[in-house]
Amino acid sequence: QQDYTGSHFDF
């Protein structure tokens, strides 16, 4: 599990 909080990730 990865936490992409505060960054821009397009899924």
Curated annotation (Swiss-Prot):
Q: At which residues is Pyrrolidone carboxylic acid found?
A: Q1
Q: How is it modified after translation?
A: Isoform 4.2Y4 differs from isoform 4.2 in not being sulfated.
Tissue specificity of this protein = Expressed by the skin dorsal glands.
| Gene Ontology BP terms | defense response; regulation of blood pressure
Highest taxon above the source species: Eukaryota
For this UniProt record, the keywords arranged alphabetically read as follows: Amidation, Amphibian defense peptide, Hypotensive agent, Pyrrolidone carboxylic acid, Secreted, Sulfation
Annotated signal sequence range: none
* Any single Gene Ontology cellular-component annotation: extracellular region
Q: Does the keyword Secreted apply?
A: yes
The protein's location, in the record's own words, is: Secreted
Q: Which residues carry this modification: Sulfotyrosine?
A: Y4
Principal place of residence: secreted
Q: Tell me the residues on which Phenylalanine amide occurs.
A: F11
Recorded family membership: Belongs to the gastrin/cholecystokinin family.
Function (record text): Hypotensive neuropeptide.
Q: What is this protein called?
A: Caerulein-4.2/4.2Y4
Task: State the organism named in the record.
Answer: Ranoidea citropa (Australian Blue Mountains tree frog)
